[in-house]
Amino acid sequence: MRCLYLHGFASGPGSAKGVAFAEAFARRGVEVERLNLRVPSLAHLRLSAMIDHVVATIGAAEQVVLIGSSLGGLTAARVAERVPAVRALVLLAPAFCMAERWRARLGDDGAAWRRDGSIEVFDHAERRPARVDVGFLDDAAATDVGWPTVTAPTW
């Protein structure tokens, strides 16, 4: 059975959580593949592309477990809706209804994001400021509609 770790927003496969999961599972003889979900890039991040990337990575696998943190948790749940090979999910603070919550929280900053076309965020993987275009928010709003319908056991 394959086990994939999906990192959160502005993070990467080398995140502390991803490394901790990989090391803990390795001690038990299980390899955790830590995917890079910065697709096509952090600047032009798209939830739909993240989901497609995970689906393509799973490919013809018969069984897979997805571990997702924040945006990676949302991605994992949306993948599980589409891929019967997902046998279980471990979700850490999944970012369900993310676009809706971000719009409410950002207020004037959200309006500036739309006006300017991008917003500055802290890139945790690169440890520096970076910009993400507003297409990320629009794509998330179109892709993350309603609560995910997941039938796989979820923790």
Regions found by a protein language model. Name each.
Residues 13, 35-61:
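Catalytic nucleophile-loop/oxyanion-hole region of alpha/beta-hydrolase
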Residues 58-62, 83, 150:
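Glycine-rich phosphate-binding loop signature in dinucleotide/nucleotide-binding domains
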Residues 64-65, 154:
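Generic beta-sheet signal
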Residues 67-76:
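Gly/Ala-rich beta-loop-alpha elbow adjacent to hydrolase catalytic centers
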Residues 85-155:
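The alpha/beta-hydrolase serine catalytic core
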